[in-house]
Every structure is written in structure tokens, then in C-alpha cells.
Amino acid sequence: MPWRLPTGHQLCRLCLLRKPRPALKIKPSSACVTYGTDSQSDKENKRTVEKLSACSVDIRKIRRLKGWVLLEEETYVEEIANILKELGANKTVIASILERCPEAIICSPAAVNTKRKLWQMVCKNEAELVQLIEQFPESFFTVKNQENQKLNVQFFQELGLRNVVISRFLTTASSIFHNPVENNKQMIGVLQESYLNLGGSEANAKVWLLKLLSQNPFIVLHSPRAVGETLKCLQGQGFTDSEVLQLLSKLKGFLFQLQPGSIQNSISFTKTTFECTDYDLRQLVVKCPALLCYPASVLEERIQALLKEGISIAQIRESPMVLELTPQIIQYRIRKLNSLGYGIKDGHLASLNGTKKEFEANFSKMQAKQGRPLFNPVASLKVEE
């Protein structure tokens, strides 16, 4: 039987048979408005949405990133915006801060004002404070343990750290301020004592400590026990106090993140691979502390990648810093050097080392040198009469 479209009479019968859908019921509410989606219906605080919109905040961004904030019953949009405005932030900056850190609106104004006073302890002026808040809003609007944070700021100031360094800690290493101030003091004392026990001078102890802390503030989060175990492990491997102190300074305190077992495995692998004496091994590690940081499996992978490029073990031993680079970076740099006719197999590996910026700068110099004429046609010739 051929297929046919239903007639108008048949369509009417179908419509009568179909059960009508119930009308959508919306409960009136002064506190929230309902937004329907395919998967769920989120109840948002209408007053919060309206106040954020009045601040020129893109509500869509908040819904996409941290929509839960809009569900909170108690918010302080106007109060937080006013605090930022009092500091000198314009409307655009305020909107940007609230879009990227919408949880700011659930912080009590009193807590935010306390945090404001805390950050003002290390900022030169309010303009600098606003700039920091704009760059790191989440750090500023984390308002727990404020009294402990204040004690830590005062401790670091008494220790001799500059305010610009402390402000950097507040924004990028805020966890150290939540650490009990007694713990931070204890760890600083352990580091200073370790420095002196390893042969460091009393006169240079404070300078060394402040430099170490500014390079790696997270070092205070380690336990004194971990420090003792790491130092004991290195000394057990034959490293002298002077060599351990060099490693501690070069690794900027990251040395204490290494487990004794991992250190022993890396040292054993290095000694076997390079077939060196205990003394040569220690010199190699001091020259390239990364040999301690990477697991034996990573070191082996990188050595094999270098060998495939025709580089010898002797070359690697002469310039071990090359092991700080991944195989992909090594391959890329070798190709670039080969494009200049530089035979890495026969040369020194130092040209491969360094950061990306350093390598590119050296490569540009080599490139310029290669294109330079053998003589300067403009310079006058010295002719003997």
C-alpha cells in the first residue's frame, strides 16, 4: 500500500488523541529567578544578578565559571564594589575583578577590610594595592586565618625581607601565610642552623637565608625532620659539608623535596652510567644538581635520546647540564645548530644549554657571526711600505 500524507480530518483526530502538556508553573519569588536549561534549572539570587549587572559584570562568565556563587542567599556586591572603589579602582577594574573572582561577593565586608589593612602593610600606596588585587583577586579574597597572616607578615618584615618580596609572597605563595607563624619561625631557625653547621659564615648567614627564602618561599612548609633526613642522606653518600651547601644553594631549597631513596637511586644510576669515581661523581652532581632531581628513568631516557643523535657519554659527562633538557628540546636545538653547519657531534654541548631565551640569543650571535664577511671592506688597509 503506497504511503500517503494524512488528510485534514485525520490530523484533527490525531490532535484530539494526543494528551496536552501541562502549562509551565513559575512560582513568584522576590529573592530568586529561575533559568531553565536542557539539563537543570538553576535558582539564582535575583538581587545578586541585578547588582552585578549594575556593576557592568558579565553574568554569563560567572555562570560558566562559578555559577554556584549566584545561588548564594547572602551576598555583598555593593559593599565589595565600594571597598574597591574607595581604593581607587574604576568601574572597569571592579567588573574585571568580580568576573574573575566572583566569590569575592560572599566575603563579609569586615573581613575584606581586614585583608585590605594587611596588604597595605606591604604596599607603597593604594594604587599599588589595587594593581595587586586586579592581578591576583583570589589571593586577596581568601580571608581565612587573617590574624595568623598578619603575624607572618610581621615576622618576615622583622626577618629583613623587603615589602616588595613579601607582597609577591602574598600573591603567589599565599599558603605560607596560612602556616602557623611558630612553624615558619622554627623552619627558618633550622635552615639557619644547617647553613652554619655546613660551614657557612655567621656574617653571611642572614644574606644567604633571605636569598634562599626569596627564591623559594615554600621551603618553610617543609618539616625540620625532612631537612635533617636529606642532609644526612647526602653526607652518607660522601658529600662534604661544602658540597652539600653548594647543592642547597643551587637547588634553592628544592633539595628538601627529594626523598632519600630517590637521591640514592639517582646517584647510583649516575655513577654506573658515567663510570666515575666517588670524587668525580660528587663533582658531577655539584656541577649539575639536576642529576639528583630527576628519577633514574628520566635520566636514562634523556641519555638515550642524546646517544641517538650521535653524542657520546664523554660529551655528556663534560657538559651534564644538557640533561636538564627534554629530548624534544634537544632535537629542536640540534636541528637549528645543524642548519648553521655546526656539528654538535664533534663540538662542545654547551651550545645546547640554557633557557629558551638564552639559547635563541646565542643562536642569533652564531648566525650573525656566520654571515659576517671575512674582512671589512670599509676599513682602511694597513700596507707596509
Curated annotation (Swiss-Prot):
GO terms for cellular component: mitochondrial nucleoid; mitochondrion. Binds mitochondrial DNA and plays a role in the regulation of transcription of mitochondrial mRNA and rRNA species. Residues 1-35 form a transit peptide. Keywords: Mitochondrion, Mitochondrion nucleoid, Transcription, Transcription regulation, Transit peptide. Transmembrane segments: none annotated. It comes from Mus musculus (Mouse). The gene is Mterf2. GO terms for biological process: regulation of DNA-templated transcription. Monomer. It comes from the Eukaryota. Its main location: mitochondrion. Pfam families: mTERF (PF02536). Belongs to the mTERF family. It is found in: Mitochondrion matrix, Mitochondrion nucleoid. The keyword Signal does not apply. One of its GO terms (molecular function) is DNA binding. This is Transcription termination factor 2, mitochondrial. Gene3D superfamilies: Transcription termination factor 3, mitochondrial.
